[in-house]
Amino acid sequence: MTPEFFPENINVISTKRYNQEKPKVFSNGFDSFNIADHVGDDPERVSGNRKKLVQYLNLTSEPRYLNQIHSDKCLRFSSIECEGDALYTNKKNEVCAILTADCLPIFITDTLGQEAAVIHAGWRGILQGVIEETLKSFVSKKLVAHFGPAISKENFQVGSEVRDQYLSKDKSFNSAFKTISSKNYLDLYHAARLILNRHDIYKISGGTQCTFRQKDEYFSYRRDGKYSGRMANLIWIG
């Protein structure tokens, strides 16, 4: 798919929790199209799912996956490092991938379609600056963004210490929180939008899905706990 505002040569996809070739069977989070190999699922099934993804998308190369650590690290596709939470490329057919269940996947490209990146933006990563660090990788300053599926504010309760950390970093994050009966709820979409806007990125699509609420479509760690699989979020330059 090509999101709104994105050049036609930029390819973006977020997988769902089921393989459309099979019935939806949800006795646990792993009886479906899980792409993560670190959550306790059968390694052979995960490997098979990854191969099906490559075949379905007719990719010429394997996606590059990271060992995600909720950090601010953005790696170039060619980097020998394996730990990080964002991938950047400026070459064709280098498929950058991050895995999510509730965290926010952010896709970024320039208006000419010569650079691309995908970010794993959970509350920790956003707080640590993973979005800002990824933007530093881009040569172009004319950028657009797309939000993949993440947990919605209504279903993402966080502790008061999380809110305090955000407000200590920037008071404007107050608008990303809602407090109901002394309970704090964080809007990841809004928090990310604030950061992107501060870097003159206003053309942003997506941000309407909820991984927690849309059980038939998405994995959710907050909803399913340790039996939650992960969706793959891919971007590449065609």
Language model region names:
Residues 1-238:
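Active-site microenvironment for binding and transforming phosphate-containing groups
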